[in-house]
A protein has these predicted regions:
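Intrinsic disorder/low-complexity segments
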Residues: 1-23, 280-285
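Alpha/beta catalytic cores of nucleotide-metabolism and tRNA/nucleoside-modifying enzymes
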Residues: 20-39, 44, 50, 164-166, ...
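Glycine-rich, positively charged N-terminal anion/phosphate-binding segment
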Residues: 24-30, 43-118
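Hydrophobic faces of well-ordered beta-strands that scaffold small-molecule active sites
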Residues: 38-41, 64-66, 100-104, 127, ...
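Active-site beta-loop-alpha junctions enriched in small/polar residues
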Residues: 43-45, 69-71, 105-107, 132-134, ...
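Short acidic/polar active-site loop segments enriched in Thr and Asp
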Residues: 61-62, 125, 198, 253
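Short glycine-enriched, charge-decorated loop/helix-capping segments at active-site entrances
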Residues: 79-81, 142-148, 275
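Alpha/beta enzyme core
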Residues: 114-127, 131-143, 152-229
Length: 358
C-alpha cells in the first residue's frame, strides 16, 4: 500500500489524451448481484484507505466507495488509481475482505469513460461517479455537485461510462438533491437511472445545504419512487435510531454511512444487531466498548505513521479522535492530550504509553 495522492498531484498526472466514444462496446444488461445493505461513504480528506481498513475490521459494512479520483482531459496511468485506492492491489478489497469501489470525478464524458474503462480492468466491484462533491474548487471546474445544474450532461456522462465498462462491472453514482436547491432532483436522478447506472446513492441535502442538518430523507423517497434502480439513502445517520427513521422516511433499506461511522465505528454492526432483534444500545455512547476500539486506534496510528508523510501524521490521528470524542470520554481525554502536538515522535510515545500491545 502507498499513500494517497493530493488533489494537486491527481490533477498533474498526465499521460494519454482522451479520444472518442466510437470504439466502446455496446452495453447489454446482465444479471447483477443483489445490492448490499450498508455502504461506507467516500469522504475526501477523511475516509481514505487507512480509515477504511480500520472501520471495515470492526465489521458490518458490505462495500466501501473510495474518495474521488479527479479526471480532467487525460487518461490516467494505472498507478494513480492504485495510489488512491491501494485496495485494488488486494483484489479490490480491504484487508478485512470488504469490497471497495473506486469513485471518479469529472465533467468530460469522453475522459470519464476512458478512465472508467481503465479502472474497471483492475476493479472487480465496479466504478462510481461523483455528482455530489460540494467543494468550491471542484464546483468551479464544473465537477461534483455543479453537474446537478445540467441534467442533460449527466445523461451524456452515465451512458458513456456504461458503454465503456464491461457489462458485468456495475456502474453507480452518488448525487446530492441539487446545487442551490432541489428543483432538479428528480430530473437528475432520472437522467442517471435511465442512462444505465446500476445504483444511485442520494445524499439528502443540496450543495448549498453543505453538511448542515437536517437531511431531507423524504426527498430520497420521491427519487426512489421515480426511478427503477436501487436507491441508497445517505446523510445524518449518526445512530441506530437515525438509521431506522431514515429507512422509514426514505423508503430505502440501503444506507450509506459517513461521519456517523467515523464517530461510532460500531454503528454498522449495531444497525445489523437491531435488525436481528437486539435491543438498541444507549444513545450517545459508542456501539463498541472503548477497550475494544483502543487497539484499533493504535493500529490506525501505525498505518498513518508508516504510510503518510510525517507532517500529516499527528493531524490524522487528532482528526479521528475529534470525531470519536462525541461518543467516547476516553477519546476526549486523548484528543485534549494531543491537541497541540504535531511531532510524530511525541504522538508515538503517547500511543506506546496508552495503547496496550497486542
Amino acid at each position: 500500500l502507498t499513500p494517497t495522492l493530493s488533489q494537486r498531484e491527481r490533477g498533474q498526472e498526465k499521460r494519454t489524451p482522451c479520444s472518442d466514444l466510437s470504439s466502446y462496446q455496446k452495453y447489454s444488461s446482465l444479471d447483477k448481484p443483489a445490492p448490499p445493505t450498508i455502504l461506507l461513504a467516500p469522504m475526501e480528506g477523511l475516509l481514505d484507505f487507512v480509515l477504511r481498513d480500520i472501520l471495515t475490521r470492526v465489521g458490518g459494512v458490505d462495500r466501501c466507495v473510495s474518495e474521488f479520483i479527479r479526471v480532467s482531459d487525460t487518461l490516467l496511468p494505472e498507478r494513480v488509481f492504485t495510489r488512491v485506492v491501494p485496495e485494488l492491489l488486494n483484489g479490490g478489497r480491504t484487508f478485512a475482505g470488504v469490497p471497495v469501489r473506486p469513485q471518479l470525478l469529472g465533467s468530460d464524458a469522453v475522459c470519464l469513460a476512458e478512465n472508467a474503462a481503465r479502472v474497471a480492468g483492475i476493479s472487480p466491484f465496479g466504478v462510481d461517479l461523483n455528482f455530489g462533491c460540494p467543494a468550491k474548487v471542484v464546483n468551479r471546474h464544473g465537477g461534483g455537485a455543479a453537474l446537478l445544474q445540467e441534467p442533460e450532461l449527466l445523461a451524456t456522462i452515465v451512458p458513456a461510462v456504461r458503454r465503456a465498462v464491461p457489462a458485468h462491472i456495475p456502474v453507480s453514482a452518488k448525487m446530492r438533491l441539487g446545487f442551490s436547491d432541489a428543483s432538479l432532483a428528480l430530473e437528475c436522478a432520472h437522467a442517471i437511472a435511465s442512462s444505465g447506472a446500476d445504483e444511485l446513492v442520494v445524499h439528502a441535502r443540496t450543495k448549498a445545504d453543505g453538511y448542515r442538518p437536517p437531511a431531507y430523507w423524504e426527498r430520497v423517497a420521491d427519487i426512489g419512487a421515480a426511478v427503477s434502480i436501487p436507491v441508497v439513502a445517505n446523510g445524518e445517520v449518526w445512530t441506530v435510531d437515525d438509521a431506522l427513521r431514515c429507512r422509514a422516511v426514505s423508503g430505502s433499506h440501503m444506507l450509506m454511512l459517513g461521519r456517523g461511522m467515523v464517530t461510532d465505528p460500531g454503528l454498522a454492526l449495531a444497525i445489523r444487531a437491531t435488525d436481528a432483534g437486539a435491543a438498541p444500545h444507549a444513545q450517545g455512547q459508542g456501539s463498541v466498548a472503548w477497550r475494544t476500539l483502543l487497539p484499533l486506534v493504535g493500529d490506525f496510528w501505525q498505518l498513518v505513521h508508516s504510510r503518510l508523510e510525517p507532517r500529516a501524521q499527528a493531524g490524522r490521528l487528532k482528526q479521528w479522535l475529534n470525531f470519536l470524542r462525541r461518543r467516547y470520554p476516553e477519546a476526549e481525554a486523548a484528543y485534549m492530550a494531543l491537541r497541540t502536538v504535531n511531532d510524530p515522535k511525541v504522538v508515538a510515545a503517547w500511543v506506546a504509553a496508552n495503547v496496550p500491545e497486542r
